[in-house]
Amino acid sequence: MSKFLQQKPIILASSSTIRHKLMKSLGLDFLVLPSNCNEEEIKTRHKSDELVELGITLAKIKALDVSQHYPEHYIIAADQLCVAGKRVFNKPLNHQTAVSHLRELSGKQHQQIACLCIVKESKILWQYHETATLTLHHLSEKTIEAYLQAEKPYQSCGAYQYEGLGKWLFKEVQGSEDTILGLPLMPLVNALVNLKVVGI
């Protein structure tokens, strides 16, 4: 870390390589320790239609899970939900499901909801959510197949990687790129400064 920033110990509780890169772009020193919580079980148990509430709940559970083992660290956790109407598009995990997701989203508007929280000593110090709205072009079967073969975005909600070739799939985007990628940086920077986790 440069002499420009003074910081307290930070852990990013995420296995996402893109979140790791976004955090690195801030010039912070941090550990990466993903939570072991069962996201699918939490989603199944969640009864409310409030999807933001679900995303915030997932982020909190991840952060609290890591915080109990590292009380001296500030834990940053995030969750990303890809939503069209009331339908949540989870990571497709395989080619067939990715095809199905892109067919369903083709030509339509959907949202990427990024939810964040910061926890220290098992106390929630800050939580936040931000939404980006995206509209895909009408995608032919040939385009869907060619894109999936090129990028294999099976670990990405919505079955695309916006940070890569995925940008070519979109007709319109409203919202910041880092929100689409799952880590809204300016709100996070302000929170870290306000909580005195990072000083300049």
UniProtKB/Swiss-Prot annotation:
<dbReference type="GO" id="GO:0005737">
    <property type="term" value="C:cytoplasm"/>
</dbReference>
<comment type="function">
    <text>Nucleoside triphosphate pyrophosphatase. May have a dual role in cell division arrest and in preventing the incorporation of modified nucleotides into cellular nucleic acids.</text>
</comment>
<dbReference type="InterPro" id="IPR003697">
    <property type="entry name" value="Maf-like"/>
</dbReference>
<dbReference type="InterPro" id="IPR029001">
    <property type="entry name" value="ITPase-like_fam"/>
</dbReference>
<dbReference type="GO" id="GO:0009117">
    <property type="term" value="P:nucleotide metabolic process"/>
</dbReference>
<keyword id="KW-0963">Cytoplasm</keyword>
<keyword id="KW-0546">Nucleotide metabolism</keyword>
<keyword id="KW-0378">Hydrolase</keyword>
<dbReference type="Pfam" id="PF02545">
    <property type="entry name" value="Maf"/>
</dbReference>
<comment type="similarity">
    <text>Belongs to the Maf family.</text>
</comment>
<protein>
    <recommendedName>
        <fullName>Nucleoside triphosphate pyrophosphatase</fullName>
        <ecNumber>3.6.1.9</ecNumber>
    </recommendedName>
</protein>
<dbReference type="GO" id="GO:0047429">
    <property type="term" value="F:nucleoside triphosphate diphosphatase activity"/>
</dbReference>
<feature type="active site" description="Proton acceptor">
    <location>
        <position position="79"/>
    </location>
</feature>
